[in-house]
């Protein structure tokens, strides 16, 4: 455990941020899985919006977001 006051604060903030990021990533995965289960235009739009939002917040890398959207679009086209 950290002894310095600022290190203690950072450790607490890290735990909170980790919980928040985990929840957001889980929600993103859920939306993508919903699209894969039922690939419709509406589900694609929801998944695409969620992916873009995650990328803009820094949750996932912009290149990963682009790759994911491309793969979902290909699945929708088939």
UniProtKB/Swiss-Prot annotation:
User: Which biological processes are named by the entry's GO terms?
Assistant: translation
Protein name per Swiss-Prot or TrEMBL: Small ribosomal subunit protein bS20
Gene Ontology terms: cellular component: cytosol; small ribosomal subunit
Cited InterPro entries: Ribosomal_bS20, Ribosomal_bS20_sf
Q: Coiled-coil intervals in this record?
A: none
GO terms for MF:
small ribosomal subunit rRNA binding; structural constituent of ribosome
The role this protein plays is: Binds directly to 16S ribosomal RNA.
Annotated source species: Streptococcus thermophilus (strain ATCC BAA-491 / LMD-9)
The alphabetized UniProt keywords are: Ribonucleoprotein, Ribosomal protein, RNA-binding, rRNA-binding
